Amino acid sequence: MSALTNLKETAFLRAFAFAKIPLLAWVRPTVVDFTAARCEIRIPLSRRTRNHLWSMYFGVLCAGADLAGGYVAMRQIQQSGHKVVFVFKDFHAEFLKRAEGDVHFSCEQGLAMAALVQRAIDAPGTRVEEAVAVVATVPSRLGDTPVARFDLTISLKLKG
């Protein structure tokens, strides 16, 4: 994905977060990569996001997982042109290491989200669900070694 596209996606994400979910705007997310198949969001380790141990606060890690998994679903819904209601049904987290740097949150299930949106459109009034996995890494310190893993169930329903 081009740097310009990522910049546009970041601007869109931050504007949406500022208008609808200000807490997410507060952590200053950046879109690192966004395609039909995957989404990678970076949240910087800063005074806003760190805890007393100088690692990323677990609430911010959860917000990053929300962003990576949710942004994929939100963009797929927008591209469909239909009014689909989107909520998280459940959320499971496994914290593996301290996140002592900027954290990258990756979701590789964009195509599954596109299929889920289509299932919601094809079954009006019925709630459809799909589990998505998000992996958090700190490339500057640990490379591809995960610092946390998240499983979120996304639930969609065609509005109307």
Listing of model-derived features with the role each one plays in the protein:
Residues M1-A25, R48, H52:
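Alpha-helical membrane-targeting segments
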Residues A3-T5, E100, G110-G160:
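HotDog/MaoC-like acyl-thioester-processing domains
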Residues A25-V31, K89-F95, V117-R119:
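Short structured motifs
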Residues W26, A36, G64, A68, ...:
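Short connector loops at helix/strand junctions that flank enzyme active sites
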Residues W26-M56:
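Catalytic strand-loop segment that frames the active site of acyl-thioester-processing enzymes
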Residues T30, H92-E94, S106-E108, V135, ...:
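Residues located in well-ordered beta-strands
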Residues P44, R48-G70, H82-K83:
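Hot-dog-fold acyl-thioester-processing enzymes
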Residues V72-A112:
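Hydrophobic beta-strand-centered segment that forms part of the acyl-chain substrate-binding groove
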